[in-house]
């Protein structure tokens, strides 16, 4: 399929890690419920059943510091959506597809589901596959959407690639939609890097958004809607040089500060809307796409998610991989593409 978001007529590939260290020391175990990956830098799990997609909640261990992700998972996937209200046909929708605006959860911007269900909570079961290479381990998984709004087809396919490179405290990922529907502004909703659970800032000290700057934990002690503050909206806000969303972790028992847990969208222009608001937890919903697309086309975004010691380190890693929206993997290697 051709991409409706290509940045040029030709695809430009970046081949990664040709002379990287060996990944033979990676431990990969698989059960009926999950795939677990252990490297010298990280531990992480990918769930097959229950709450699925991305890296499982609190499974990603940074061995350098001993910290884990404090949320519901990393690079977690929801619905295919578009701007607009579903009010005219809401009584015909499966309840899981109904979208109510004008509240603390969704704010004032009208949006509606094209296809569902929400993958993370309703897919129930996926069949992830492991790919091992000389300098990485990867997991691929996909899901075919099975519900749709009136007048829309079911059957679009979500695909995800997660690559764990040798010697890194992060993974590289891609989410891709191969659509059976047309839309003026179709987007995929994900959690990036992932939601942040806390009690009055006990698990984090501050948030850093590359398009907003640093925000203290105290700003998230009370609930507020996503469009009240700290949100990003393409077209309203300047396009940032980098698109990075991160929080500095804190040990809830000792108060000791830990590493930054960051999610980077490697091509900033693909992001149409991004939230950072409090709703019992800090909600890091991100939406990418939001451009015209025809049935039979596809769109994707590429990410880096993991642990970093400083904002400078995050910026350096972003700059090494900037501009990419695709990720391909085989036993021979993995590569980011534009």
Model feature map: region roles:
Residues 8-17:
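Bacterial N-terminal signal peptides
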Residues 18-24:
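Boundary at the C-terminal end of the N-terminal hydrophobic targeting segment
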Residues 26-38, 228-338:
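Beta-strand-rich recognition/accessory modules
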Residues 1-9:
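Bacterial N-terminal signal peptides that target proteins for export
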Residues 41-48, 156-164, 258-265:
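Broad, structure-driven detector of short, well-ordered beta-strand segments within folded domains
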Residues 32-146:
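Acidic-aromatic substrate-binding/catalytic surfaces of carbohydrate-active enzymes
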Residues 29, 48, 128-200:
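Acidic, contiguous internal or C-terminal segments within carbohydrate-active enzymes
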Residues 181-256:
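Polysaccharide-binding surfaces and accessory modules of carbohydrate-active proteins
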């Amino acid at each position: 399929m051709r991409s409706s978001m290509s940045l040029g007529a030709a695809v430009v590939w970046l081949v990664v890690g040709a002379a990287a260290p060996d990944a033979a020391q990676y431990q990969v175990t698989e059960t009926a419920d999950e795939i677990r990956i252990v490297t010298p830098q990280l531990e992480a799990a990918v769930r097959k059943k229950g709450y699925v997609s991305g890296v499982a909640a609190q499974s990603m261990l940074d061995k350098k510091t001993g910290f884990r992700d404090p949320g519901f998972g990393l690079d977690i996937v929801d619905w295919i959506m578009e701007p607009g209200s579903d009010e005219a046909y809401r009584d015909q929708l499966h309840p899981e597809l109904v979208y109510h605006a004008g509240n603390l959860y969704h704010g004032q911007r009208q949006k509606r589901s094209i296809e569902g269900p929400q993958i993370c909570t309703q897919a129930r079961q996926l069949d992830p596959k492991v790919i091992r290479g000389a300098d990485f381990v990867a997991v691929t998984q996909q899901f075919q959407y099975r519900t749709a709004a009136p007048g829309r087809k079911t059957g679009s396919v979500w695909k995800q690639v997660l690559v764990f490179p040798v010697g890194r405290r992060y993974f590289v990922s891609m989410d891709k939609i191969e659509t059976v529907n047309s839309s003026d502004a179709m987007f995929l909703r994900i959690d990036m890097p992932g939601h942040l659970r806390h009690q009055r800032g006990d698990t984090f000290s501050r948030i850093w958004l590359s398009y907003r700057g640093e925000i203290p934990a105290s700003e998230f002690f009370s609930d507020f809607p996503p469009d009240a503050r700290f949100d990003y909206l393409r077209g309203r806000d300047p396009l940032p040089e980098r698109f990075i969303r991160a929080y500095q972790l804190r040990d809830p028992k000792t108060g000791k500060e830990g590493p930054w847990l960051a999610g980077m969208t490697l091509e900033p222009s693909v992001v149409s809307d991004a939230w950072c608001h409090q709703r019992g937890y800090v909600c890091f919903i991100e939406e990418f796409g939001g451009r015209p697309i025809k049935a039979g086309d596809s769109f994707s975004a590429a990410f880096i998610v993991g642990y970093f010691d400083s904002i400078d380190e995050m910026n350096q890693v972003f700059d090494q991989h900037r501009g990419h929206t695709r990720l391909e993997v085989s036993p021979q290697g993995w590569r980011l593409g534009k």
